[in-house]
Amino acid sequence: MATGENRTVPDNLKKQLAVSVRNIQWSYGIFWSVSASQPGVLEWGDGYYNGDIKTRKTIQAAEVKIDQLGLERSEQLRELYESLSLAESSASGSSQVTRRASAAALSPEDLTDTEWYYLVCMSFVFNIGEGIPGGALSNGEPIWLCNAETADSKVFTRSLLAKSASLQTVVCFPFLGGVLEIGTTEHIKEDMNVIQSVKTLFLEAPPYTTISTRSDYQEIFDPLSDDKYTPVFITEAFPTTSTSGFEQEPEDHDSFINDGGASQVQSWQFVGEEISNCIHQSLNSSDCVSQTFVGTTGRLACDPRKSRIQRLGQIQEQSNHVNMDDDVHYQGVISTIFKTTHQLILGPQFQNFDKRSSFTRWKRSSSVKTLGEKSQKMIKKILFEVPLMNKKEELLPDTPEETGNHALSEKKRREKLNERFMTLRSIIPSISKIDKVSILDDTIEYLQDLQKRVQELESCRESADTETRITMMKRKKPDDEEERASANCMNSKRKGSDVNVGEDEPADIGYAGLTDNLRISSLGNEVVIELRCAWREGILLEIMDVISDLNLDSHSVQSSTGDGLLCLTVNCKHKGTKIATTGMIQEALQRVAWIC
């Protein structure tokens, strides 16, 4: 983040960003400028936040415009970042620093996830050619990333932060000597009209002038600000031998014929290892490459047809050469915010350079040991060891004490098993041997024999019941015929007597004391009652009440009336503990059926 005297961005850049971001309704806008203190490095220039807000703290009047609120929120986020940085950098406690750190309008708990992303981005720096901003400046073309939260960290170094902030679309394009980055939480397909709209809004504002205190700082050419590319002429070539002992990399050179016919050597490598990396400290400023820009007469159009796939491949290849893992930087920033470390720099490569030189120290990429292998080994170790943690007790060898306990419990179990077998042997009469297999075999055979006996008894009982019912039916038919004949005779006699006898004389029914018209058969709990008597009104209900009073539960009732007789058959069962005898049932029914 550019601070102090090395600030290379104008004061009105935030307002230009605010107008552009609000117009396209994206979440934020960041301008990455080339560092004045570390050439070849992109750092935070300025930014504008336009996303969701969790807590708003302001001491201004309520009628402040929304535009001013957005600028105020962006400024509060910048002050919060500076206060957190100052609080860590001055642990000894300068009173001025402490007062400034405590004056921040926001605190970390007031921020949303998107604001956290915007805040942490202030601590990022990029080598030219590294990450999305560095790749956009290196290739001179915009980079549109639609899957920011799931992108590879080698391509998008802030993918972890983007995932936490639900950020989906990030766009970077070179502009005004730096890189302009815009992002949103919505998924937006690639549309160059968005980039053109942002550029147009910037051009409508006052002209952009770069303010820098370094006299030896050269302006970086923006290839998208003009219709054609302007080649960079190398007026002083590298020495054929390097005092640092590093191998000299070959370069591609083309010849260019000027209007005056002069031939010069030009290089189309806008960004390469010569810019993003460093030459050894022994080289002074006179050994460095001096670059100049030509005018309109010296322009030559380069081939603009570059594949986006190749560009992303170059970004990934360059990101593989980074000396530090992205997660280390993320952890460093978070630990700084929570006051557990004093580091806010991306890595040691930005601390080991010569402050008197304009270049950082160059390191061969092959000698850099990346942390990717270590991370892969750690992931594999976790995947293999975590599932085995639940089976730790099974894998650990038993101690002598545990072995003794197991043996004792096994001995007790065997003793109980032997006792059960001996009990079983005493119950089964046909067991002749005492071994366990013989006991089990004899037990199985004995149980099968018992099952056969039960089946035989059940079949015998069913046959006996069937025979009893058949016998009762046979006895029932002749009795019915005799009783009907006698009843007919009695009726004829009764009719004859009715003619001779006066109406005031009672008729003789002739059924009192007859026991042949009542039969009671009992088999176990089942009782069958067969009754024939003279019919009168309500006699059936009286008979059923008597049966119920004798603790008999009626299951089926068959009744018929004819010629003044009631024929009744009741199948019932005894209920309860008090069982009525056949004599009691017969006496009770006779009192009801043959009332004179």
From Swiss-Prot:
It is found in: Nucleus. This is Transcription factor EGL1. One of its GO terms (molecular function) is DNA binding. The gene is BHLH2. The lineage of its organism: Eukaryota, Viridiplantae, Streptophyta, Embryophyta, Tracheophyta. Keywords: Activator, Developmental protein, DNA-binding, Nucleus, Transcription, Transcription regulation. Transcription activator, when associated with MYB75/PAP1, MYB90/PAP2 or TT2. Involved in epidermal cell fate specification. Negatively regulates stomata formation but promotes trichome formation. Together with MYB66/WER, promotes the formation of non-hair cells in root epidermis cells in the N position. Whereas together with CPC, promotes the formation of hair cells in root epidermis cells in the H position by inhibiting non-hair cell formation. Also seems to play a role in the activation of anthocyanin biosynthesis, probably together with MYB75/PAP1. Involved in seed mucilage production. One of its GO terms (cellular component) is nucleus. PROSITE patterns: BHLH. SMART domains: HLH. Efficient DNA binding requires dimerization with another bHLH protein. Homodimer and heterodimer with GL3. Interacts with CPC, MYB0/GL1, MYB5, MYB23, MYB113, MYB114, MYB75/PAP1, MYB90/PAP2, TT2, TRY, TTG1 and MYB66/WER. GO terms for biological process: epidermal cell fate specification; jasmonic acid mediated signaling pathway; regulation of DNA-templated transcription; trichome differentiation.
